[in-house]
Amino acid sequence: MSASSSDPFHSFAKTSFTSKAAKRATAHSLPPLPGPGDLPPGMNVEYDVAIVGSGPIGSTYARELVEAGFNVAMFEIGEIDSGLKIGSHKKNTVEYQKNIDKFVNVIQGQLMPVSVPVNTMVVDTLSPASWQASTFFVRNGANPEQDPLRNLSGQAVTRVVGGMSTHWTCATPRFEKLQRPLLVKNDPVADDAEWDRLYKKAESYFKTGTTQFAESIRHNLVLKKLQEEYKGVRDFQQIPLAATRQSPTFVEWSSAHTVFDLENRPNKDAPKQRFNLFPAVACTSVRRNDANSEIIGLDVRDLHGGKSITIKAKVYILTAGAVHNAQLLAASGFGQLGRPDPAKPLPSLLPYLGTHITEQTLVFCQTVMSTELINSVTADMTIVGKPGDPDYSVTYTSGSPNNKHPDWWNEKVKKHMMDHQEDPLPIPFEDPEPQVTTLFKASHPWHTQIHRDAFSYGAVQQSIDSRLIVDWRFFGRTEPKEENKLWFSDKITDAYNLPQPTFDFRFPGGREAEDMMTDMCVMSAKIGGFLPGSYPQFMEPGLVLHLGGTHRMGFDEKADKCCVDTDSRVFGFKNLFLGGCGNIPTAYAANPTLTAMSLAIKSCEYIKKNFEPSPNPVKHHN
């Protein structure tokens, strides 16, 4: 069908039609509370705290508040799919730690794109008898309102219990001061101290460390070479990682489960605590009172049984991610629905919802370690004969002051060369991967990850030994701009019948991203040559999955153009809190999860001071 007035959908975008989700956002009547027999198993009508989302930020709120005696319910749109440890990292299996490239498929299977423009390619070879689309055809979850030139095409979400922490890299650096939002005004010393206090607690929850790869040959090859090449100019270290090394060959990667065991309580390990997790239960909106001063209900839908229920609580916390937090608010009458129109007045509730969003630029390449580096692995070895010959031997002098490598290194190399004489590489098969960084500084304002890990891209072809491969990922910051927006359709809904998210985003101009690319190219060349097919390149906008600023934090709603205060409380509402990277209002290049967790800890401290848990009858039982 041609794009003409004969097409009934030709001018659909200009009609007054609004979706059911948009109508619900402006509704004022409350549905009746369900009776006891109408609730899914284990669900009550009322709790002290209702949390939406089960990722590491939701788990932080749950841990802090459950341990303080609150009766907490957590609602997660996704399901439990991470094994016996609910919300655990899926890389915590021997299979994936032996072959990290296999984990790429796990990540790809978990990620759901946020906004996909309609493919305008015409299929002109269909049979004349086949139904053909109009110009406004919504197919396969595509978004007809998305401008492909202003999209974050790589942006995606994960809908499972544990969220993205079930497959993330576990990189948890602190924000350098230039990246951090202020928590204490006009007192830099006090602000530094507050951040240090919060970061320390968050690091303890995540089990962050910087020594898990200290006895990796590949890690030390890369680390020492870069330290040597940039001596006195740049500092290199292990990436701060949320992980615990269990053995020389196995690491337990942290996740939401590490922060808080998502098992229902009371149970045998926590007989006096109250917590319930409800997977496959979607939050559809929050209910405001007539005065718009507090939340009086949380609308949820059981995705298995199909029932819609309103839950009551003293405190409501949205931790469903930077996209879904804003989406739920827009579906509840906050901000505005529909394409932003500068001619219209700002909405009265959260006028800056979805404005000033940020996402990081990303440059990527892969290198194959140089012959010089590989030859240096055996610098302390005395090799007699040829592999496979009866007289073949590999020895070294333990503890010699002339050794270039420590004994643990030499012992691993010797054992591998003797046990696996068929292998031309002297690096043990199970040698841990490199995990190196040079952190964000004013002189080079980008974050770096020089490592070998699984992402939704960057798998290594089978013809190359992965022990030789080093991944280079450099992340750049983006200054918050009001014109960079995430908005929600009043006509189109997503797969869960919520207003469709749409991006209106462009990376600001400037030299910083190009300087970052140059830095990566120069630095990576010191380690080896580029892997064919993985030459230096800018990656899709949004592929970093570090979207921020969708519900910004600040001190004053109007002056700072923000949505929540420094306790993560929504302006004007005494009992609604938002958690996650959407709160971060600054230009940042580093991984934001640790910072978002720190803000959640501060938010919990406010909640514990201003709300009382209900009496716990379990406490009176022996």
Curated annotation (Swiss-Prot):
Sequence positions bearing Tele-8alpha-FAD histidine: H167
Required cofactor(s): FAD
Signal peptide, first to last residue: 1-28
InterPro entries tied to this protein: FAD/NAD-bd_sf, GMC_OxRtase_C, P2OX, P2Ox-like
One Gene Ontology MF term: flavin adenine dinucleotide binding
Known EC number: 1.1.3.10
Thermal dependence: Optimum temperature is 44 degrees Celsius. Active from 30 to 55 degrees Celsius. Thermostable for 30 minutes up to 50 degrees Celsius.
Gene3D superfamilies, per the entry: 3.30.1920.50, FAD/NAD(P)-binding domain
Entry superkingdom: Eukaryota
Binding residues for substrate: Q449, H451
Subcellular location: Periplasm
Subunit structure comment from the entry: Homotetramer.
Family: Belongs to the GMC oxidoreductase family.
Designated name of the protein: Pyranose 2-oxidase
